[in-house]
């Protein structure tokens, strides 16, 4: 810029320097303005007008619409800084001071319409010390604070993908050194990258921040001793939140080590392949296991269900406790319905507690908390005389201090609370001795106005004279213009209108001063009382959060009981055996999408001492993929403590589930279909154990027939004969040669998707039966897909030629394909 900057633009540049990579919204009167590149971004993303002044691009949004526009920007991954102007007292001259008082980023949301109701919203910091990686993540909206440490990038990436943060924080050197890790994360997650000063990630700075935040002199009590990279990440994250984003951190829970409790591990690829949270194709959520299982009534219960779905239990005790509770509520139908109704009245206790702790709560939020806590007492009343299962014992014994708080909120507040403190009418008259007195004065003012209006009408003889109020004028007397000369001299003219004149009197002015004084006093008093009430609630925050956890647990098991009742699910036997036996099992998602009674159930029997691997053959569209996915989903549900869609089941606890299903190019990685397939299969071979469940669909199909067959057989042999890798495996394949493995290994059993023929046309039965498939019916599927009839006919001719004796492999060579 060649021209001299105005004082206001100098001020903008100072704020922009502080905002860094954030889009700066700069308050100018009743608008928030953006300049230069920020103006272009604002105009492009919000569809607002871009203008120029002195060759400076600018665009703006009304101050009254700020929150909605900011949410739109943040939802697109932008970080936004808000520069507010200080109150300018009347008559003051010069430039109004402006400072940044808020920075909003995708991961650091305390209260926003962007917060997913039944999912966490994490900001995650990552750091490296030597070969160790430390991470720390926060959900500011509920105060959850997690840390972890990993010695390899694979486990690090898997952990971050499970947490699914919306914002990632580190320093420049880490981003440069670990570009490959960041690239992988960006391929799996929609994530905003944020950069922070490197010194905040140093041990001395990080520990000091943690000590200050939690008012301790040692981190050993949190179990963090020796976890230097994790401590560095945690301290830097706190510094970023408090010092950079200017957000409160006093409400955070003490840091907990993520993954300390062992879970059934489901890697990101398997979560996607099994469509746990969202379908691979179609609308978001619909067709996923989460959508089928989601019967929760509270946000806390919904978050618990989602987290448990991708982190099922490995501890048998945890599984059994929840199964017992599901069974209890399945049998108690009337109680279940009552609890469902009462749970639906409980709002997000965790996020309400956070809003109150961070001074962001409105009176309406306090009313929501009150109503939710009252609903919790009704739930407790309904449970107190029940012989509850162990999982829920004593969880709804509401502590006396919390009972006292609930009583205060129930008796001392007005039922319908306002959105803003400034609107008043928050507390009952008896809450404070001055409330009733001031309210009476304010209320009596209405009758005084009516009496005064009637009196001066009689005195002046003007029957249409009115006493009115306007924000700009205050109280005034209005008469028609032609009647104004009839008013006495003590009437003081205030304003002339087209057909009316407005006046005041000394008496009316004196009344106005008294009323305004009362209103100011009343607002000041209620504001003070509201702050004191919020502080009183914050003192009970831990008890509220404990009750919130109890509500989430109850909601979780009641919702699973509701699901079991709706679809006639049965309780699986889960134990430490290596059994996998399912009678009349059904795919939980497909079951809900088909007409009742049309889904064909199938059995599964696997045992390490007998069948460890099922080789599944059959044509496309016959149900192979549905069947093998079904087994994995039923195991996941069982280890969540849920009942499952089966007549009966015996499931030995599984430690990991791996899937290799389908294939697709990953152009962003520069990986072909076959490379993706091989990379995912390699991951399975390296990480599967004897207690794992492996689902493989069409391994080796992305290369030549014999290459693919050789790879497929080598994978089968590895999983059958390598100590520590003998996972239960379901392998769907079109390679008929592999079915001969059954003759060479007692742990392999052939099954196929049954097809009947009618006049040469296949009829898919969707039954999985013993033996291998004789035909693939691929040409029939091509015909169903709409191939031109000439192409179908030619394919049949070529197939007959291939099946002729001249093109069949020699017996010796064919036999070599199945030799170990």
Curated annotation (Swiss-Prot):
Keywords: ATP-binding, DNA damage, DNA repair, DNA-binding, Nucleotide-binding
Pfam family, one: MutS_IV
A GO molecular-function descriptor: ATP-dependent DNA damage sensor activity
Positions bound to ATP: 618-625
CDD domains tied to this protein: ABC_MutS1
Alphabetized SMART domains for the sequence: MUTSac, MUTSd
Keyword Nucleotide-binding: yes
Regions crossing the membrane: none
Keyword ATP-binding attached: yes
Gene Ontology BP term (one): mismatch repair
One cellular component (GO) term of this entry: cytosol
HAMAP family: MutS
Family stated for the protein in its record: Belongs to the DNA mismatch repair MutS family.
Chain's role: This protein is involved in the repair of mismatches in DNA. It is possible that it carries out the mismatch recognition step. This protein has a weak ATPase activity.
Protein name per its UniProtKB record: DNA mismatch repair protein MutS
Gene that produces this protein: mutS
């Amino acid at each position: 810029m060649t021209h001299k900057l105005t004082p206001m633009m100098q001020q903008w540049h100072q704020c922009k320097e502080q905002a860094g990579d954030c889009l700066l919204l700069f308050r100018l009167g009743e608008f928030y303005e953006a300049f230069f590149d920020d103006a272009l971004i604002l105009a492009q993303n919000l569809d607002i007008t871009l203008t120029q002044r002195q060759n400076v691009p600018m665009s703006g949004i009304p101050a009254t619409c700020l929150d909605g526009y900011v949410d739109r920007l943040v939802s697109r991954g932008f970080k936004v800084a808000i520069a507010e102007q200080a109150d300018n007292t009347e008559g003051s001259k010069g430039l109004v001071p402006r400072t940044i008082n808020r920075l909003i980023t995708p991961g650091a949301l305390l209260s926003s319409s962007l917060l997913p109701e039944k999912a966490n919203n994490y900001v995650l910091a990552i750091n490296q010390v030597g070969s160790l990686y430390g991470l720390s993540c926060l959900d500011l909206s509920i105060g959850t604070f997690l840390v972890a440490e990993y010695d390899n990038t694979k486990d690090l990436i898997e952990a971050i993908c499970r947490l699914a943060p919306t914002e990632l924080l580190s320093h420049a050197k880490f981003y440069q050194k670990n570009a490959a890790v960041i690239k992988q994360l960006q391929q799996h997650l929609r994530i905003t990258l944020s950069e922070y000063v490197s010194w905040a990630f140093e041990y001395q700075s990080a520990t000091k921040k943690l000590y200050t935040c939690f008012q301790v002199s040692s981190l050993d009590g949190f179990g963090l001793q020796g976890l230097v990279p994790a401590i560095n990440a945690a301290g830097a994250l706190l510094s970023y939140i408090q010092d950079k984003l200017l957000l409160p951190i006093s409400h955070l829970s003490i840091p907990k080590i993520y993954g300390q409790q062992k879970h059934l591990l489901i890697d990101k690829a398997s979560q996607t392949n099994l469509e746990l949270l969202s379908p691979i194709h179609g609308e978001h959520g619909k067709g996923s296991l989460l959508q089928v299982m989601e019967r929760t009534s509270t946000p806390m219960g919904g978050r618990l269900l989602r987290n448990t779905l991708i982190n099922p239990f490995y501890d048998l005790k945890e599984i059994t406790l929840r199964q017992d509770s599901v069974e209890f509520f399945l049998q108690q139908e009337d109680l279940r319905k009552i609890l469902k109704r009462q749970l639906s009245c409980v709002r997000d206790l965790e996020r309400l507690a956070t809003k109150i702790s961070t001074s962001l709560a409105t009176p309406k939020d306090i009313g929501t908390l009150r109503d939710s806590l009252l609903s919790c007492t009704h739930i407790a009343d309904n449970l107190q005389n029940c012989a509850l299962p162990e999982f829920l014992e004593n969880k709804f014994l509401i502590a006396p201090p919390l009972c006292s708080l609930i009583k205060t909120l129930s008796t001392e507040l007005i039922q319908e609370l306002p959105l803003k403190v400034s609107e008043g009418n928050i507390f009952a008259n008896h809450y404070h001795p001055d409330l009733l007195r001031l309210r009476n004065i304010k209320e009596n003012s209405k009758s005084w106005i009516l009496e005064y209006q009637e009196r001066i009408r009689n005195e002046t003889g003007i029957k249409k004279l009115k006493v009115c109020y306007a924000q700009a004028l205050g109280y005034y007397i209005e008469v028609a213009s032609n009647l104004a000369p009839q008013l006495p001299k003590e009437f003081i003219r205030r304003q002339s209108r087209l057909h009316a004149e407005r006046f005041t009197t000394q008496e009316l002015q004196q009344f106005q001063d008294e009323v305004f004084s009362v209103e100011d006093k009343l607002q000041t008093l209620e504001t003070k009382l509201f702050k004191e009430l919020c502080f009183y609630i914050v003192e009970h925050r831990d008890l509220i959060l404990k009750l919130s956890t109890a509500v989430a647990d109850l909601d979780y098991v009641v919702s699973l009981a509701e699901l079991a009742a709706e679809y006639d699910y049965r309780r699986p036997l889960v134990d430490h055996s290596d059994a996998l036996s399912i009678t009349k099992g059904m795919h939980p998602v497909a079951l809900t999408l088909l007409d009742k009674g049309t889904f064909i159930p199938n059995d599964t029997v696997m045992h390490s001492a007998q069948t460890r691997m099922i080789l599944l053959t059959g044509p496309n569209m016959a149900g192979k993929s549905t069947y093998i996915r079904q087994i994995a989903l039923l195991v996941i549900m069982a280890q969540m403590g849920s009942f499952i869609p089966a007549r009966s089941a015996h499931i030995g606890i599984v430690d990991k589930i791996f899937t290799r299903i389908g294939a697709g190019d990953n152009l962003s990685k520069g990986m072909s279909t076959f490379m993706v397939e091989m990379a995912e299969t390699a991951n399975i071979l390296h990480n599967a154990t004897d207690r794992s469940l492996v689902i493989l669909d069409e391994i080796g199909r992305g290369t030549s027939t014999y290459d693919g067959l050789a790879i497929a057989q080598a994978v089968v042999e590895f999983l059958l004969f390598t100590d520590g890798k003998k996972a239960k495996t379901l392998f769907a394949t079109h390679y008929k040669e592999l079915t001969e493995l059954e003759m060479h290994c007692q742990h392999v059993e052939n099954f196929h998707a049954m097809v009947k023929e009618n006049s040469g046309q296949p009829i898919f039965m969707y039954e999985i039966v013993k033996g291998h498939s004789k035909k693939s019916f691929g040409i029939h599927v091509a015909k169903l897909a709409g191939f031109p009839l000439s192409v179908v006919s030619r394919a049949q001719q070529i197939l007959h030629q291939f099946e002729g004796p001249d093109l069949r492999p020699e017996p010796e060579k064919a036999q070599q394909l199945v030799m170990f």
